[in-house]
Amino acid sequence: MARLTAYERRKFRVRNRIKRTGRLRLSVFRSLKHIYAQIIDDEKGVTLVSASSLALKLKGNKTEVARQVGRALAEKALALGIKQVAFDRGPYKYHGRVKALAEGAREGGLEF
């Protein structure tokens, strides 16, 4: 059996804590150029809402773009009646672009 990397251990630890809450999960994925966010219903295994800097064709400062993606995701979620989610930062530290996305989602009206 292969040993897990620190990245994988962190990802599983954070995700298992969030799944116990029973809330919808706001999951974040960060690449070198773009940031992606989606709200997932783990009970049904369905993505309800998604937004990304790639789909929105946003350019500029990556931190500010992440904030705009968070706002866009919150607007889509509120349109579907989703107000409360659990923030799944995955293996990433709550800092920089991940933090900016979370703040943008809060500004847009999501609670977590």
UniProtKB/Swiss-Prot annotation:
GO biological-process terms attached to the record: translation
Gene3D superfamilies in the cross-refs: 3.30.420.100
Pfam families, A to Z: Ribosomal_L18p
MF terms in GO: 5S rRNA binding; structural constituent of ribosome
Recorded superkingdom: Bacteria
Function: This is one of the proteins that bind and probably mediate the attachment of the 5S RNA into the large ribosomal subunit, where it forms part of the central protuberance.
The protein's assembly and partners: Part of the 50S ribosomal subunit; part of the 5S rRNA/L5/L18/L25 subcomplex. Contacts the 5S and 23S rRNAs.
Family affiliation: Belongs to the universal ribosomal protein uL18 family.
Protein name, entry field: Large ribosomal subunit protein uL18
Organism: Thermus thermophilus (strain ATCC BAA-163 / DSM 7039 / HB27)
